[in-house]
From Swiss-Prot:
CDD domains: PSAT_like. Homodimer. Pyridoxal 5'-phosphate binds at A78, T79, W104, T157, D179, Q202, N244, T245. NCBIfam families: PRK05355.1, serC_1. Its cofactor is pyridoxal 5'-phosphate. Keywords: Amino-acid biosynthesis, Aminotransferase, Cytoplasm, Pyridoxal phosphate, Pyridoxine biosynthesis, Serine biosynthesis, Transferase. One of its GO terms (cellular component) is cytoplasm. This is Phosphoserine aminotransferase. Its EC number is 2.6.1.52. The modification N6-(pyridoxal phosphate)lysine is found at K203. Binds 1 pyridoxal phosphate per subunit.
Amino acid sequence: MSLYPIYNFSAGPAVLPEAVLRTAQQEMSDYNGTGFSVMEMSHRSEMFLSILHHAEQDLRQLLKVPDNYKILFLQGGATTQFNMAAMNLAHGFRTADAVVTGNWSRIAYEQMSRLTDTEIRLAAHGGEQFDYLDLPPVETWDVAPDSAFVHFAVNETVNGLQYREVPRLSDGMPPLVCDMSSEILSREFDVADYGLIYAGAQKNIGPAGVTVVIVREDLLERCPNDIPDVFNYRSHLNRDGMYNTPSTYAIYMSGLVFRWLQAQGGVKKIEAVNRLKAQTLYETIDGSGGFYINDIHPDARSKMNVVFKTASEDLDRRFVLEAELQGLCLLKGYKSVGGMRASIYNAMPLEGVRALADFMRDFQRRYG
């Protein structure tokens, strides 16, 4: 047993609120007096339908989702949405646009290009322009007005990049399709600025196994009839999200997280905490005199995934090892980037971030 509190900085599946885990533990084998677990519950039972309904309504309230938007709890992760969004929304259009700002938006662009006859245009490429150290401003995106949509990722978990202001396009432009997997519920934004939002749950929503999709109702008219029903948004909505058996336990856990976030004061309150957490780490990095390195442009630094490194890979490995011995876990950076990555999603308490900052200063004192 560790002598230190354990803080999980994993990029995903990620830390869950302690209060949520306690509730799940208490209800594990006997949900609400039923005598059995949610994992054993029929997805068509009144009990589970109530869980699903409350999860949807709580998410709608937290994000202020307008009435003309539908919410789905699907499977397959955000990577499935790379294809599903294009298959459903690009039908009948000559082009659709994509913005590449890092690892995941690059993969999305590549995947979208495979499964549709529509040409997927590059509206901007942060790798070519900035070597993934800055973000192409929205006003520089080369968007074709008659494109089916514009796809982008607002936060790049691997590269540690995030748009400071959540992007929006002017009226008359194509709808925005946004991968919000790693930042949804972390700050306020206007859902009405988007045509479709999707997010894998395993970062800011709940455990892996469910993917949230929020889609504007009029866009469902685009869904073609010649794609498999399981990949058709309209098919899922026509069956009230029950086209196939949903990820019942992951939805239940996500609902607990929504209730926890409401108890914290909602998205506005958690946004202020998230800002302070990120500020704490970036001030530690910038105040290290170059011992810790983060080359991201200050205006493009992620408040969810703080990436940094030292002057050598050997020292990086020592940092990760010694941090884990002090209860600061899963700080190793993504394999293609290296270094360290501290993922500080909603459920990461400020105390955990302060403990990491203290360790960083102590590590620098000993090895700097």
